[in-house]
Amino acid sequence: MVRAERLNPTGIHWPNFMVADMAGRIVGAVQIRKHSDGSRELGSLVVAKDHREHGVASRMIDRLLEDEREPIWMITSEPYAEVYARWGFERIEPSAAPVKVRFNYRIGRLARIVSFFRRLPMRRLVILERLPVERRAGIKARRRPAPVEPMASTPAA
């Protein structure tokens, strides 16, 4: 399933996969790659074509991330970046990503060039980062402007 969708074949470690099973058939798969530099990357997300648009991917991601307390990165096509915001993923510059994630990003960009010559659809890739809930809350609190106190109303003369 992962190979059939032409996803990044590096870092596939089958024990790390979560699969969605329906009536004994695997209809989806996703993993968190654990890189040698300590970074972790959500990847190899795939759902069988006849089960797409039914929430299979969302349920797998919900389950996979529910107990995560460490930062996680992912590489996705630009049109899909906003979809992952619901799980706390935010777009970052490639230079801000860990070395191994940047390496996978570069592999993906090279694959795009091959796609161009094979006349396959090309999509721009982006890197997303998901911080732990505690750190996300702190960052959002710092970004939020201070509340403005309402002025006391005085009766008109």
Task: Please report, for each region that a protein language model flagged, where it lies by residue.
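Conserved GNAT acetyl-CoA-binding A-motif
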Residues: 66-79
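Short polybasic/polar patches that bind polyanions
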Residues: 3, 52, 85
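Short loop/turn microsegments at loop-to-beta-strand junctions
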Residues: 14-16
